[in-house]
């Protein structure tokens, strides 16, 4: 798949295309031709073809497509779902509608919609947001009952093209015909469940229209993942493959430190040193022999204190990545510890969980960093980092991560069912999310994997995206022919070597 565009980027391209001799009217004609071709390929002379038409330019695409279908001898009918078209282009298309095309109003034809052989959604375009209005819900309920082929024009109505949010009654397409580039929201949950197969069709927009558009969003797929895997020379030794120093764990949160360590070691890092509370050392060292341990000073509740910073920074001199936060806890002392490590560490830092929470009160310390910093927030942590609500983040998760990355010069791995790896103007979209990972410990594994890839030499953006791809794909593998309900973090860790073998040997 090529580049993905935001709604704003696509709108810019449509208007910029005029500089290269393609008008908005011509773009509508080109889109309609592509839509009509897909409709015709799924129809026969006897097919009952019903196009659901909105008032805007999405409806205009459908009206022009109806004319083209009529020219081919097919018998399309159009249903005006929101009244007559009201944009310049859609009104002009309506005025040119062939007299052989049957025109109906939605309120009288719900049974007609249900009985369509090919049902085409041209109601709402990329400007849709919020919920479907009550007065149009009967149309969408009729669409639900239709057993014919369902095709969406540009995106299914009811889907938000900016963030992937979707009304529960959104048009559920078998095929979505989208134009020039895929729109971001089509590839995000829950919208992806309404899109069916996504066909990206050329409508004559010159790629030079995109030259000034940032961020550049591309999917992170198996080809990119294999290319990003750190090279392992045959004569390599443990020092060749890097060392992670991890500041993690506390008396209250022992498991997080162990899960992140095991995930890192299962993904190829040569050495892993865990700097943690003595109680964590005593617990984990009895069964996890592969890493080394350093007991740190703690307060009376078993959380690490800031005076450990000097010791940890000394250890960083012989390491290639510093991981901070898994099970660390959040106190005034961890805030000081995290700030001092960020300000003084000269190796790349991966900051997760309570590392992020401890950073938030002193976030401007990121401006004093001496090395690369990767933040791995889930939506609530991203909201804290940005000083906004979770709702504001979820309405524009990419924008939130992008602005954070730009402001502080950091790499942001914005976790969710679909994950964005953001580094300045470059964004990877990772879509391997699964409910297998909707359990405690998943974030700890991800942080460990990302730190492992950084320690082995990956740049920050590749390490973040590859980490997300690795965890999601391994979780899918661990859950193969097993219930996602019953998979736990250790099952995923145990499956990592198999996933990496498959990736290394992928065609």
Residue ranges and their predicted role:
Residues 89, 135, 169-172, 276, ...:
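Short acidic-hydrophobic sequence patches enriched in Asp/Glu that either
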Residues 117-118, 123-215:
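Internal gly/pro-rich beta-alpha loop/helix module
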């Amino acid at each position: 798949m090529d580049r993905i565009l935001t709604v704003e980027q696509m709108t810019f391209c449509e208007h910029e295309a005029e500089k290269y001799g393609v008008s908005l009217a011509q773009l509508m004609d080109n889109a309609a031709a592509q839509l009509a071709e897909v409709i015709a390929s799924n129809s026969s002379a006897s097919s009952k073809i019903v196009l659901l038409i909105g008032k805007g330019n999405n409806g205009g695409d459908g009206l022009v497509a109806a004319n083209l279908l009529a020219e081919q001898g097919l018998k399309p009918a159009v249903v005006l779902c929101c009244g007559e078209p009201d944009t310049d282009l859609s009104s002009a298309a309506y005025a040119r509608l062939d007299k052989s095309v049957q025109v109906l109003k939605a309120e009288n034809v719900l049974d007609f919609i249900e009985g369509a052989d090919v049902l085409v959604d041209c109601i709402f375009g990329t400007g849709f947001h919020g919920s479907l209005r009550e007065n149009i819900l009967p149309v969408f309920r009729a669409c639900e009952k239709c057993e014919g082929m369902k095709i969406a024009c540009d995106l299914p109505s009811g889907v938000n093209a900016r963030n992937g949010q979707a009304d529960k009654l959104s048009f559920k397409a078998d095929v979505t015909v989208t134009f020039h580039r895929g729109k971001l929201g089509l590839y995000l949950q829950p919208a992806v469940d309404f899109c069916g197969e996504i066909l990206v069709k050329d409508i004559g927009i010159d790629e030079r229209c995109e030259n000034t558009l940032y961020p550049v969003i591309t999917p992170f797929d198996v080809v990119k993942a294999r290319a990003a895997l750190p090279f392992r020379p045959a004569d390599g030794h443990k020092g060749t493959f890097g060392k992670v120093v991890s500041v993690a764990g506390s008396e209250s949160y022992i498991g997080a430190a162990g899960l992140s360590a095991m995930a890192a070691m299962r993904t190829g890092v040569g050495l892993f040193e865990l700097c943690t509370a003595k109680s964590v050392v005593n617990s984990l060292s009895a069964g996890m022999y592969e890493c080394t341990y350093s007991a740190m000073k703690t307060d009376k509740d078993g959380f690490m204190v800031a005076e450990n910073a000097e010791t940890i920074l000394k250890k960083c001199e012989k390491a290639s990545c510093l991981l901070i936060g898994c099970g660390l806890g959040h106190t005034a002392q961890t805030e000081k510890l995290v700030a001092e490590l960020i300000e003084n560490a000269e190796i790349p830092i991966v900051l997760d969980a309570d590392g992020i929470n401890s950073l938030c009160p002193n976030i401007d310390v990121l401006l004093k960093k001496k090395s690369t910093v990767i933040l791995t927030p889930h939506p609530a942590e991203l909201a804290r980092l940005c000083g906004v609500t979770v709702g504001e983040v979820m309405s524009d998760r990419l924008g939130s991560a992008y602005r954070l990355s730009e402001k502080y010069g950091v790499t942001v791995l914005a976790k969710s069912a679909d994950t964005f790896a953001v580094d300045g103007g470059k964004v990877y979209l990772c879509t391997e999310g699964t409910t297998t990972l909707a359990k405690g410990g998943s974030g700890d594994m991800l942080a460990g994997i990302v730190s492992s890839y950084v320690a082995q030499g990956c740049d920050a953006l590749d390490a973040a995206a590859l980490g997300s791809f690795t965890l999601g794909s391994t979780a899918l593998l661990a859950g193969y022919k097993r219930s996602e309900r019953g998979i736990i973090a250790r099952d995923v860790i145990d499956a990592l070597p198999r996933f990496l073998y498959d990736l290394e040997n992928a065609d």
